[in-house]
């Protein structure tokens, strides 16, 4: 188990060496802008994905977390598309679709498009500084990344694990007195079966 306070997470963001573990894709922006590099984050660790994503934003890159199962060939194709097509001027980060049509596709978002909605979203789902949410999955999926950042935005606690064992999930849920769960329906069914 790894635990981070907000201060430790901030220190990890500042000290993250994103250039050694992720792929930088340069592109020529349509207009003059400081943001001309997309960082394709390739890491299996949820915590490292989060730290690198936040560090990339902090350092002026446009981060995009690659799905864990993406092969090198597709990442190369994605890098070529980004390099040749660029990204919208308003883009602060990229997310990938789930790939239901065969291959994940990039979607470009602005920080504002999320941050302006967090308070509304958190109110709807009763998320605040006392929230303890369990979630399972990769930070590369937009629902997971949105929920993590929304909970951190409110000052809440995020609990996750790389374990695929529902019994481990239940242990963590009980240990940390989790009051919210965010998971795909298939994972929720697994969880219910083991309760």
Regions found by a protein language model. Name each.
Residues 1-33, 72-75, 85, 109-112:
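Conserved AMP-binding/adenylate-forming core of the ANL superfamily
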Residues 39, 56, 97-100, 133, ...:
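Conserved S/T- and glycine-rich ATP-binding loop of Class I adenylate-forming
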Residues 18-69, 135-139:
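Conserved AMP-binding/adenylate-forming
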């Amino acid at each position: 188990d790894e635990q981070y306070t907000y201060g430790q997470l901030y220190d990890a963001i500042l000290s993250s060496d994103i250039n050694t573990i992720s792929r930088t894709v340069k592109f020529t922006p349509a207009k003059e802008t400081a943001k001309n590099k997309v960082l394709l984050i390739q890491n299996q660790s949820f915590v490292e994905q989060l730290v690198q994503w936040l560090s990339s934003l902090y350092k002026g890159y446009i981060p995009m977390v690659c799905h864990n199962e993406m092969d090198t060939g597709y990442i190369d194709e994605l890098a070529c598309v980004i390099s040749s097509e660029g990204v919208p001027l308003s883009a602060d980060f990229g997310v990938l679709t789930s790939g239901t049509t065969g291959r994940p596709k990039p979607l470009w978002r602005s920080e504002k498009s999320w941050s302006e909605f967090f308070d509304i979203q958190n109110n709807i789902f009763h998320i605040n500084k006392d929230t303890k949410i369990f979630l399972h999955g990769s930070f590369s999926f937009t629902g997971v990344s949105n929920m993590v950042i929304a909970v951190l935005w409110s000052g809440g606690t995020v609990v996750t694990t790389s374990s695929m064992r529902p019994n481990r999930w239940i242990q963590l849920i009980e240990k940390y007195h989790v009051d919210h769960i965010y998971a795909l329906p298939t994972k929720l069914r697994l969880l219910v079966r083991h309760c």
